[in-house]
């Protein structure tokens, strides 16, 4: 074989591989960002949707496997985890004339929201302790010092909230954080992702 051809084939191969996320990471569609102040105050939602059914992708830590178990993702997740708001408005609407059913649905929703929000908050606090110098994480930690009601009060003032609520079942309806003044979202900052050594070595090679 012609050495130049072989080199070209190798080069093309590396080019293709260069687009694969490093182990431990994945490209994730994230439809909405909570923009927080450095003090952890909710400022606004940032809409990252592109067209009708897609959103911008970010390179974040690989998602956790959960069939029905409660397990939080790394600084991003669905509304039940990040906002303590479950996508159950339709169920409530459907049962609104059946008092018993309605009560059951509301109870179920409430316990699901509490459990998932707590899992996400605990995860945020763990990450905060592991990376104590991160201003981003300090802000997110501060945000989660509020309870479910405070969070809902803050986000429901946002003009995007009604539209977000209607689209919670969409594939892109994942939420993450950007701190005001930062270009990157917190969940894609490599130095905060606590990749284990093998993942880190591969990440270095991928640069």
Say what each PLM segment does:
Residues 1-207:
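Conserved phosphate-interacting/catalytic interface
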């Amino acid at each position: 074989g012609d050495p130049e051809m072989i080199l070209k084939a190798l080069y093309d191969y590396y080019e293709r591989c260069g687009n694969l996320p490093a182990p431990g990471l994945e490209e994730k569609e994230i439809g909405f960002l909570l923009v927080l102040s450095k003090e952890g105050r909710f400022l606004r939602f940032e809409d990252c949707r592109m067209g009708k059914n897609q959103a911008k992708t970010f390179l974040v830590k690989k998602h956790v496997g959960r069939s029905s178990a409660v397990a939080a993702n790394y600084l991003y997740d669905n509304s039940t985890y990040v906002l303590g708001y479950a996508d159950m408005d339709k169920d409530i609407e459907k049962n609104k004339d059946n008092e018993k059913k309605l009560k059951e649905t509301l109870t179920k929703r409430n316990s699901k929201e509490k459990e998932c929000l707590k899992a996400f908050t605990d995860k945020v606090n763990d990450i905060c302790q592991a990376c104590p110098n991160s201003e981003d994480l300090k802000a997110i930690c501060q945000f989660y010092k509020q309870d479910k009601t405070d969070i809902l009060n803050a986000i429901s003032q946002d003009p995007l909230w009604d539209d977000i609520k209607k689209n919670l079942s969409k594939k892109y309806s994942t939420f993450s954080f950007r701190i005001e003044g930062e270009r990157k979202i917190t969940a894609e900052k490599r130095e905060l992702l606590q990749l284990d050594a093998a993942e880190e070595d591969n990440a270095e090679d991928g640069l």
